[in-house]
Amino acid sequence: VEGPQVGDLNLFQANNLEEKFYSGKTRALYGTHISVGDKMFSSFPYLRSLATITWDTLDWYGYDKDGGSVHDVIGTRCDPYTSKLISGSDYHHCCHSNITRALVKEKGLSKDEVEKIVHDVLNVFMLTGFTNDTKQYFMKSSPVRPGDFLEFFAETDLLGVLSTCPGGDCGSQHSSDIAKCYPLKVSIWDVDKKFLEGIKVSKVSSYNRNHGLTD
């Protein structure tokens, strides 16, 4: 709301935290980046749409000459373990840690319980891709500006956890306090019931989960 800022989003089914956003399956179904009309699927054994993107003020960006785009489901999330591996330092305000603290506070769980369910994110507003030559993951400064937003239609009761990334617009680095960061605003709206007519309820997978163990 004040400047260019990336956010890391975790989504959970509000009454069952084991059902959570599955970025890998969403990526397999839609591609490296998602936008209007794309659904955010949940983890096994549930595999259903948790939410659908209904409005994206950055949909004009598309893909640039480097193959970069916004709202990626290829990056994971900045985390203290990778930071420790690379830099040797303990940094506690990575997106993984921010989400962990928020869930501990909101749900009253231990950090050990929470770290088992914190998952790969939707990188909201983040501009990323793979390099043309080495196919390595890259980040560039996000084109997001105050007033831009990404809108979702929740297809079940959801718990959303959004971390303001310490990388700011992620044009330089993250996992440090160097980048300029700005607040992100979350709004929750009711839907006029007339718009819900004909919409099918998102149901969990009907697979019987036998896995060939019995005849």
Task: Describe the predicted segments one by one.
Residues 1-215:
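Acidic, Ser/Thr/Pro
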